[in-house]
Swiss-Prot record:
NCBIfam families: MGSA, PRK05234.1. This is Methylglyoxal synthase. Residues 6-151 form the MGS-like domain. One of its GO terms (molecular function) is methylglyoxal synthase activity. It comes from Aliivibrio salmonicida (strain LFI1238) (Vibrio salmonicida (strain LFI1238)).
Length: 151
């Protein structure tokens, strides 16, 4: 597939997602990194977003709960170039009813070259990167070229 680029702004659009068994872990991480997160635009699936906003006071745009379509909403935002990175503390040991949605979300993040942190260690690396506060250029699929080839 042909590639093009897009500019990721210095003020990132960050998705915050956690399965039920990891909400407390994500909350702890957000509290520890509240100062670093304040300069960015935050999005979250419903239950997680309301919890994080209530407990930290951060402004978070809450979508629907994951099982009710929130994962798919995030995937759509990623496809539209409106999410720059995602912190997703998922539960690798327990299946959830919306596992196909989770897989689709991770697939679409990979397609559009969106960095995803799936645990505290990778989230720590991501949030502490000097690139967090810089404008950067990333490669993404050239969708118009893809469409032109298929029509």
């Amino acid at each position: 597939m042909k590639k093009t680029t897009r500019i990721v702004p210095a003020h990132k659009h960050i998705a915050l997602v956690a399965h039920d068994n990891y909400k407390a872990e994500l909350l702890r991480w957000v509290k520890e990194n509240k100062e670093a997160l304040q300069g960015h635009f935050l999005y979250a699936t419903g239950t997680t977003g309301h919890l994080l906003s209530k407990e930290t006071g951060l402004a978070i745009k809450s979508l629907l709960s994951g099982p009710m379509g929130g994962d798919q909403q995030l995937g759509a935002l990623i496809s539209e170039g409106k999410i720059d990175m995602m912190i997703f503390f998922w539960d690798p040991l327990n299946a959830v009813p919306h596992d196909p949605d989770v897989k689709a979300l991770l697939r679409i993040a990979t397609v559009w070259n969106v960095p995803v942190a799936m645990n505290r260690s990778s989230a720590k690396f991501m949030i502490s990167s000097p690139r967090m506060t810089q404008e950067i250029e990333i490669e993404i699929p050239d969708y118009p070229a893809y469409l032109a080839e298929r029509i």
